[in-house]
Amino acid sequence: MAKKKSKQKAGSNTIALNKKARHEYFIEDEIEAGLELQGWEVKALRQGKANISESYVFMRDGEAFVSGMTITPLNQASTHVVANPTRVRKLLMSRRELDNLLGRINREGMTLTALSLYWSRSWVKIKIGVAKGKKLHDKRTDLKEKDWAREKARVMKSALR
């Protein structure tokens, strides 16, 4: 019998990353949530047309929404649908997760930020970070540590030659 070929997609499941969030915030916890999307948005995400660098998550009436996320519509998108690239999108989470997030935001003074957008099978998921803002001196120490690690690696590489 002939063996079946396994279907593997080329590339990564990641659609968009928010590198700025890791620089601006201390990420305490990461949570996965689904997104309520329209058809043209899914097609645009398959092409990788998303930007979440300015996005944030807020709670209203016991539900979570992401704002500031831009999904650029495709050129060949339908003409009868008006595409709003920056619309507020609802996050799909369980009631227990929503209550937990709401409590952490209110009690501990945390904020919610979008960290990454990715495919999980055929569903689009967003990774949310429960975060606390960094002060300027914290950002500077992080940069110094990164520079030192880079310099250390460079010295070790040259020493091994």
From Swiss-Prot:
InterPro entries to which the protein is assigned, alphabetical: SmpB, SsrA-bd_prot, SsrA-bd_prot_CS
Main subcellular location: cytoplasm
One example GO MF annotation: RNA binding
UniProt keyword terms in alphabetical order: Cytoplasm, RNA-binding
Pfam families: SmpB (PF01668)
Biological process according to GO: trans-translation
Taxonomic superkingdom: Bacteria
Gene3D superfamilies assigned: 2.40.280.10
GO cellular component annotations of the record: cytosol
Subcellular compartments: Cytoplasm
Disulfide topology: none
HAMAP family, per database record: SmpB
Entry's family note: Belongs to the SmpB family.
Main function: Required for rescue of stalled ribosomes mediated by trans-translation. Binds to transfer-messenger RNA (tmRNA), required for stable association of tmRNA with ribosomes. tmRNA and SmpB together mimic tRNA shape, replacing the anticodon stem-loop with SmpB. tmRNA is encoded by the ssrA gene; the 2 termini fold to resemble tRNA(Ala) and it encodes a 'tag peptide', a short internal open reading frame. During trans-translation Ala-aminoacylated tmRNA acts like a tRNA, entering the A-site of stalled ribosomes, displacing the stalled mRNA.
PANTHER family recorded: SSRA-BINDING PROTEIN, TMRNA-BINDING COMPONENT OF TRANS-TRANSLATION TAGGING COMPLEX
The protein's name: SsrA-binding protein
Species this chain originates from: Vibrio parahaemolyticus serotype O3:K6 (strain RIMD 2210633)
Gene encoding the protein: smpB
